[in-house]
Amino acid sequence: LAVMLMAAPLSGCFGIGGSGGLFGEEEEKEPLRLNHLQMEGTHNSYHIEPLVSPTREYLYTHEPLNVQAAELGVRQFEIDVWWDVREGLRVYHNQYDSGTTCPTFEDCLSTLLAWSEANDRHHPLMIWVEPKDWPEQAADITTTVELSGILQDIEDEIAEFWPRNRTITPDDVRGEWPSLNEGVLNDGWPLLEESRGKAVFILLAGGDMRDLYIDDH
């Protein structure tokens, strides 16, 4: 699966070694894993301030995604995705706040992937993807589709534009265990050294959309 539904927090430490032992001996430390990381993140990571804004909440502009990664140390990104009848998956906030550094989902993926491939020892990227489907928030050129349709389109584009060997998926974490939860409890999250240069795609959704995705997978 390309998109990971994250059910547990990724920050915080679980038993990472503490103080040294007697006579200055240090206890052996647990190797760092994915869930030990804390990272800088941006919301509406693609956002450009509109020329005219109905609210002060829209008055900010983010650097392009690759600049955020390269110069600001951002490793967590949040991307809103709409389905457009003419152009497929588009990225913007809403019809009143549509400025974006990467107009399509493909643009966003390509921008981050180019940076990732040029810096392949980076800490893993957490890419939160929020599908937008509400008719009252859709722009004129946006047509609402069935929830399962936009979810499948998102997975298809991730699979097409982001190499499988550069992603961490639920199957990777689950391993040989029957469920993702059992995999985490028994084997733990992936090691940091094994996760460098990769990305985790996380579905940011609740309610019917989240339930539908879980039922389908």
PLM feature spans:
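Secretory targeting signatures
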Residues: 1-23
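Catalytic cores of phosphodiester-bond hydrolases, prominently lipid phosphodiesterases
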Residues: 22-217
